[in-house]
Amino acid sequence: MEKKPISRQGFDALLRELKDLKENQRPEILKVVQWARSLGDLSENADYSAAKEKQRQIDKRIQFIESVIENAQVIDVDSLSGNRVVFGAKVLTEDEDGNKMECRILSDIESDGRMVISCTSPVGRALIGHCVGDTCTVRLPSGQKELEIIDVKFKD
């Protein structure tokens, strides 16, 4: 499987979440499942059903995080420099109406859709590879938009 970029900070956050899920949340929900099972008839046991559903959600999240970690290409954003937009760059752009937008380009899992955008989003894909002073075209569902790259930085 192709390695997917993720920042060191994002990777470390996933490791912390995985540790919490495995060492705290999953053992706790297993205790609740065991307790609910001890109440008897499982067919009409709402506590048991709810606990099993929560256990499934936790197990699914653990599998997802383990898959992301296994296929991650960790990038130390703080070690990057230059004026070209690459994964990890914080980019200041201006559209044709004079509206400015600053965002950081990171992985899908790290994006929030506003200040941190995915490198696979339409805006992320359009910006990557361009330099300060370049204008690029972003294809959005609402139409095309021209963005001029005003600044690129990597450290806050």
Model regions: which residues?
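Glycine-rich, flexible loop/turn motifs
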Residues: 2, 38, 70-71, 81, ...
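Conserved NTP-handling cores and scaffolds of large molecular machines
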Residues: 18, 22-25, 69-73, 131, ...
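Non-DNA-binding regulatory cores of transcription-related proteins
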Residues: 75-155
